[in-house]
Design a protein with these regions (language model features):
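A short N-terminal helical cap/helix-turn-helix that marks the beginning
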Residues: 1-22
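Residue-level preference for short coil/turn positions at secondary-structure junctions
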Residues: 1, 16-18, 54, 99-102, ...
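Aromatic/hydrophobic pocket-lining residues that form π-stacking "cages" and hydrophobic walls in ligand
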Residues: 9, 71, 116
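Short, flexible loop segments at the rims of nucleotide/cofactor-binding pockets, characterized by
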Residues: 1, 35, 83-85
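Active-site-adjacent beta-strand anchor residues
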Residues: 2, 61, 106-109
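Structural core segment of the AMP-binding/adenylate-forming
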Residues: 49-50, 77-131
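Conserved AMP-binding/adenylate-forming core of the ANL superfamily
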Residues: 18-65, 69-73, 90-95
């Protein structure tokens, strides 16, 4: 079996399910290993339903958050390649990274709605099939 962060989280959740895995001091959000594993499994399953296959690139336009970690791990669990996008970049820069990396799916947070709407409006220039 290939070892990746998804496999490691699954093992840790089995060993210490109630131990805290994530703490956000700015919002007091806390997740146990069981919760983080379950949430990343949900994302992995959603990506599989979209037809994402091992080796395909999935871009993340998310702030530093539990959602970023859950998505990152979910992508790893199915063998996808994470393409993290810097929140400081503008649409032209993001378009270049998305196209250059071969990204076919983009997961984004509401903070990125305006820039993603701009990118989506550019159509096939980005080759993203799932927004």
């Amino acid at each position: 079996m290939n070892v990746n962060i998804g496999n490691l989280l699954t093992r840790r959740a089995a060993l210490n399910p109630e131990r805290e895995a994530y703490i956000d001091s700015s919002s007091d959000q806390r997740l146990t290993f069981r919760e983080l594993n379950n949430r990343s499994n949900q994302i992995a399953n959603q990506l599989l339903e979209l037809g994402i296959k091992k080796g395909e690139r999935v871009a993340l336009a998310l702030m530093n958050s539990a959602e970023f970690i859950e998505s990152y791990v979910g992508i790893a669990k199915i063998g996808g390649v994470v393409v993290p996008l810097n929140w400081r970049l503008v649409a032209d820069e993001l378009e270049f990274i998305i196209k250059d990396s071969g990204t076919r799916t983009l997961i984004y947070g509401e903070e990125f709605l305006d820039v993603v709407t701009d990118l989506h409006g550019r159509g096939d220039k980005t080759d993203v099939r799932d927004w």
